[in-house]
């Protein structure tokens, strides 16, 4: 919000002076951001905003990870203290599932070190692990059938993400030596 004053110095013409009375807050910035979003992108933004709230209520999680700004995208990255890899949490509205993985940037050797322990990693995650190797990046990936489009499933999804992210951090600490 602006306030306009008219100033005059001596015999000069009056000139406007603009004073900022109120600056935009995060709410107005968020509103500008979401104006052009699709329904699916709005859902993603709401989902990750809710995840940030769930994260802040979990002491084990907040000791290990820092929240980042919720964005209207299908992934949410968590730093685990290495520039070589991070934890990626994903939602898939088309397949009605969610996933979590260690995402390794351009380091096949590191991926192979983890893969040497694939049975133990699968046991730790209590899940069948998909070992995805691509040209630039590799992923140690798991999914579960929780539909991110159904808001009543979100608490279950958040709990799954919180649990699996902590386990992935334990995996990284144990096998990245």
Label the predicted regions.
Residues 18, 27-28, 48, 75-77, ...:
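Tryptophan-centered motif/residue detector
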Residues 20-26, 110-113, 169-177:
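Short secondary-structure transition/capping segments
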Residues 116-126, 146-177:
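Ampiphathic alpha-helical segments that act as solvent-exposed interaction surfaces
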Residues 33-147:
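Polyanion-binding interface signature
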Residues 1-37:
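Mixed-charge intrinsically disordered linker/loop segments at interdomain junctions
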Residues 2-8, 31-34, 93-102, 156-170:
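Short, surface-exposed, charge-dense and proline/glycine-enriched linear segments
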């Amino acid at each position: 919000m602006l306030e306009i004053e008219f100033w005059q110095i001596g015999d000069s013409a009056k000139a406007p002076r603009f004073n900022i009375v109120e600056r935009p807050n995060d709410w107005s910035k968020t509103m500008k951001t979401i104006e052009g979003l699709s329904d699916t992108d709005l859902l993603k933004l709401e989902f990750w905003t809710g995840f940030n709230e769930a994260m802040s209520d979990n002491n084990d999680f907040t000791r290990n990870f820092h929240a980042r700004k919720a964005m209207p995208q299908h992934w949410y990255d968590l730093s685990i203290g290495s520039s070589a890899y991070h934890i990626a949490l994903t939602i898939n509205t088309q397949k009605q599932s969610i996933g979590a993985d260690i995402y390794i940037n351009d380091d096949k050797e590191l991926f192979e070190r983890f893969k040497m322990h694939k049975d133990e990693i699968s046991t730790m995650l209590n899940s069948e692990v998909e070992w995805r190797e691509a040209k630039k990046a590799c992923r140690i990936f798991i999914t579960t059938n929780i539909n991110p489009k159904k808001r009543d499933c979100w608490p279950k999804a958040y709990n799954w993400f919180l649990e699996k992210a902590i386990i992935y951090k334990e995996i990284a600490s144990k096998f990245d030596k």
